[in-house]
Amino acid sequence: DMVTRTLARREAVQSSQIEGTQTNLDELLVFEATLGLDGLPADVVVTERYVQALQLGLDAVRARGREALDLTLVNQLHAVLMQDAADDFPKGCYRQEQAIIGPLGGRPEDARFVPSPPDRIDEGMRELERAMLK
């Protein structure tokens, strides 16, 4: 329905901005209507991936209910979000290197957020899955 579609796109814009994209809702809607980047920021393609991932997740939950909320779905969503990333980036897989959320090339102590180290991701994701399925 129209309300869900609009809210999904607003969420996609806001979520992608966490990653540093510079797209607004109007630009996303124009891109979807025209399927072209003419006069739009390239980031709109990234933001559209968020829409696709959200739709995939919603469809899975509608089809299977809460049981859809498992690590297979999380990895599928990640693969959608990262499909335009560099070829050596593991799409739908957990990272093997420490990541930071902050300035490009920045140090962990200057980061806005430092996620769990790679050796703790499997354990954390299993905990997340258990919590989602409760």
List the model feature ranges, each with a label.
Residues 1-134:
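FIC/Doc superfamily catalytic core
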